[in-house]
Design a protein with these regions (language model features):
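Bacterial N-terminal signal peptides that target proteins for export
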Residues: 1-6
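N-terminal signal peptide c-region/cleavage motif recognized by signal peptidases
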Residues: 14-15
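Catalytic loop of the DD-peptidase/beta-lactamase superfamily, centered on the K-T-G motif
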Residues: 21-57, 157, 187-200, 204, ...
Length: 520
């Protein structure tokens, strides 16, 4: 396995090894190898920076299951929601230049933008776009971008039809679509696309020459990881998420060598090249790492009890919490078959980035192992690989119990209220758009018009509820429940994820499809 040392970075010359009494590379390498196996992950790439230098960068495992091509420190991964911090950094640059303020109304730059309420539309600020307290629900609108043909402008337009889940600024609910809206501000303010601003104002100054913002950039690389997921109980390659329509929220592809430069810059309040340059002011560095939204602190499962923080907040593109008595600034990212975690401990000038080509919690397990080693956690220390594996088993057991209870309560002898042909026809949801239900070979088939992957055979469950078994196996199956008018016609259908473990981006619950009347 190849290690890329600090000579790869312009920010430092050859870096010394981590102190032997704190960190043993061979022990950590063995731990990673075990983690790959236990948490069912083909490959990972890891870098650690401290005091302005990259201490090590290294790849582990393979880029694609069943292949021999190894992951190294230059292997590209989709970093998903770790993109959000790049978007807020680019906004901070414009704030420093006086081109916008965090508390400017969004409609100052996007006059046609609307949300669910005129008051919220008028009051919503740039800060609100990136702090997850707009009143929209968790993952609201994610089905607009996921495997869809909608572009960013269309998504920003359609989010006006999303119904609120709470009052404005009253509760935290993570979202992606408003980061897309934030990306739409850049052409109005900077005269450049979000992509161009990130490339010219962030990547180029930091020397991040191996990073990009498009799916084409990622797929054109000869050293890119392949996404993997668990299907039918087996680790398998899954389709790559095309992220061009969500790039400001999750579209960057990078590697740990480039991201180490990013970490060093963030740990030095926006300075780079040994302090000779600046991305953004120290004031903006503080603002981005200041709490903006209070996060709930649920009790973790017993194996992870030690990870319960004393405080948790969301800043501007970053999560803030404590660990081992230090403030920790971090974020995670996840797309189909790809996961990432960036963790910074500002008081220690310490940063860790871990990229993996699976949807497991390996990134978290290895992050906490490194933090324990480098921050001197008291002994005996947790075995985080085992702890996260146990937590996963607990979650899956609970989900299985819920599904079994649902099966036990099902009225399997019930029949649909109508002949199947009466459910067929065109439907429309204000938020998503058009869908269709067709009778094909004696069964109903559901299709989402703007999402070609969403083609599902409707398997009767009970009464007027069916289950959409998507032909693309990596998609989460959904209950589809039809409601009838008093005269026996279909009035609407609504959806809900079948699995309790379904990712929140499968926000079926936000959809309400009604029949489209035939033109007269």
């Amino acid at each position: 396995m190849r290690i890329t040392v600090a000579a790869a970075l312009a920010l430092a010359t050859a870096a010394p090894a981590l102190p032997a009494q704190v960190f043993r590379q061979k022990d950590f390498d063995a731990y990673v190898a075990r983690g790959l196996q236990v948490l069912r992950t083909p490959g990972a790439s890891i870098a650690v920076v401290r005091n302005g230098r990259m201490l090590f960068a290294k790849g582990y495992g393979v880029r694609t299951i069943g292949d021999t091509a190894r992951v190294d420190a230059h292997t590209l991964f989709q970093i998903a929601s770790n993109t959000k911090a790049f978007t807020t950094a680019a906004l901070a640059i414009l704030v420093d230049e006086g081109k916008l303020a965090w508390d400017d109304p969004v409609t100052k730059f996007l006059p046609g933008f609307q949300l669910y309420d005129p008051y919220v539309t008028r009051e919503l600020t740039v800060r609100d776009l990136v702090t997850h307290k707009s009143g929209l629900g968790l993952g609201a609108g994610d089905l607009l971008w996921f495997h869809s043909s909608y572009n960013r402008a269309e998504i920003a337009h359609r989010i006006r039809f999303a119904r609120p889940a709470s009052s404005f600024r009253s509760a935290y609910a993570y979202d992606n679509v408003l980061y897309i809206v934030a990306g739409e501000i850049f052409p109005a303010v900077a005269g450049q696309s979000w992509d161009d601003v990130v490339k010219t104002r962030v990547f180029t100054p930091l020397g991040m020459s191996e990073s990009g913002t498009t799916t084409a950039f990622f797929t054109s690389s000869r050293n890119a990881a392949t996404p993997h997921g668990i299907e039918d109980g087996k680790l398998q390659v899954v389709p790559l998420d095309s992220v061009d329509n969500i790039s400001p929220a999750g579209g960057i592809a990078s590697n740990v060598t480039d991201l180490a430069r990013w970490l060093v810059c963030r740990l030095d309040s926006g300075r780079y090249s040994g302090g000779g340059g600046r991305l953004f002011s120290e004031a903006q560095a503080r603002e981005m790492w200041s709490g903006q939204t209070i996060l709930p602190i649920p009790d973790p499962p017993p194996p992870l009890a030690a990870l319960r923080p004393n405080f948790a907040e969301y800043g501007l593109g970053w999560r803030l919490r404590d660990y081992l008595g230090r403030k920790v600034v971090s974020h995670t990212g996840g797309l189909a078959g790809m996961s990432s975690q960036i963790t910074l401990v500002p008081a220690e000038k310490l940063g860790v980035v871990i990229l993996t080509n699976s949807e497991s919690d390996l990134m978290a397990a290895l992050t906490y192992r490194l933090l324990d080693d480098l921050l001197g956690a008291p002994r005996p220390r947790a075995d985080w690989v085992a702890a996260f594996a146990q937590a996963d088993q607990i979650a899956r057991a609970r989900a299985d119990s819920t599904l079994q209870a649902g099966r036990a309560g099902r009225d399997s002898m019930s029949q649909p209220s109508l002949p199947l042909a009466r459910y067929a026809g065109p439907y429309r949801d204000d938020l998503y758009g058009d869908a269709s239900v067709a009778l094909e070979d004696g069964r109903l088939v559901l299709r989402f018009s703007r999402s070609p992957a969403f083609v599902g055979d409707l398997e009767h469950w009970q009464y007027d509820t069916f289950i959409a078994r998507w032909r693309a196996k990596h998609l989460e199956d959904a209950y589809v429940t039809f409601a009838l008018t008093p005269d026996g016609a279909v009035d609407r259908f609504q959806m809900a994820a079948v699995s309790p473990l379904a990712d929140f981006s499968f926000d079926y619950q936000d959809l309400l499809f009604r029949p489209v009347a035939a033109p007269r």
